[in-house]
Amino acid sequence: MPKARVLSLLLNTGHALDHLFLLIFATAVSAIAAEWGMVWQDLMPYTVGAFVLFGLGSLPAGRLGDLWGRRAMMVIFFLGLGAAGLLVASAQRPWQLAVALTIMGAFASIYHPVGIPMIVQNSTRPGFTIGLNGLAGNLGIAVAAVLTGFLVQRTGWRMAFAVPALLAVLCGVLFALVVPREEMAPARKPRRGVELPASVMMRIFFVMTLAAVSGSMIFNFTTNGNSQLLAERLRGLVDDPARLGLLLALAYTVASFAQIVVGKLIDRYPLKAVYLPIVAAQVPLFLLASSAQGWVFYALVLAFMVFVFGAIPFIDAMIVRYVDDRMRSRVAGMRLAVSFGVSALAVYLLGPTVKAAGFTTLLLVMAAISAATTLFVSLLPGRVPAPSAAAAPAASATAS
């Protein structure tokens, strides 16, 4: 297999593992709570450190990716994530669990500002490449639901962390052995890419940050809450945790393919024309889901997750289209630090909010957040001014 394909395979696997690790806890939390004599809602705040560092850790990770090298950072990502997973599996007290999850979040923060710029840096179809990479990440979410449910039921919650941890270590070893060293760090390469007016760039980054924050909150609310939400709304119809995990995995798998379609559209049309209807469609679906039960609710979960996952490629597409490769990891790191740092609040509030007000209120809140995202995206310029003549040839390799 050519080295470029091996690199792509390992980077896409890394994205899957990144999301898988962050969501094992959301599926296993009921089993952990039962073992420790607690309720799952009271355990959810213990994972907030993981999501805070998942965001804040993006700043140093992005800086090191540009200035030191992306290959070395990806090796650290795989090996560190695996070690952290084994640490979670060995936790004996809630505080130990919180510390181990926080360490896991720190290593997980490396992937997005480093792995995604690495996989698109030589791509002639960045939208499709981002869509395929996003599909891999969301399949990791699907696998988290079904694999965790299976392992929890058969072998206990600790193995649900240990098995993916060993896979991550294996990927790290393969990455170190197979992927060649970079000739120079990205920050030292010659400049290539579009040059846009400062006012346009400020507007794009303003919208990108706001949309990233609200979109990340929706992503965290859904992916961390869907497992318990499905258990509540399908009670009496499906009560087996493994079957619930399978249903959730099916929904995530189907929804994940939306990113391939969206990626192809991004390569052909202005970002705003594709992004706006996708976020707008989330609003009525969350409103309908708030009062639905049974299989109707499951159909709505499938529908709204198509649009939640379909919205994921846009922020990365903005960075690829408008930011030179020399500083993409740093820009991505800054964006991720803000959006994931703020959206970590969603994880912290999930348990207490559901305990106090129920899932109906949560779904209504998500509808309001999606409406805000729609407003933010509407502020994007319809068409971006053409790049300067000097930048155009180089830009064709990175912009659709």
What name fits each language-model region?
Residues A100-G137:
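Cytoplasmic helix-loop-helix junction between adjacent transmembrane helices
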Residues Y322, R326-A357:
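A late C-terminal transmembrane helix in Major Facilitator Superfamily
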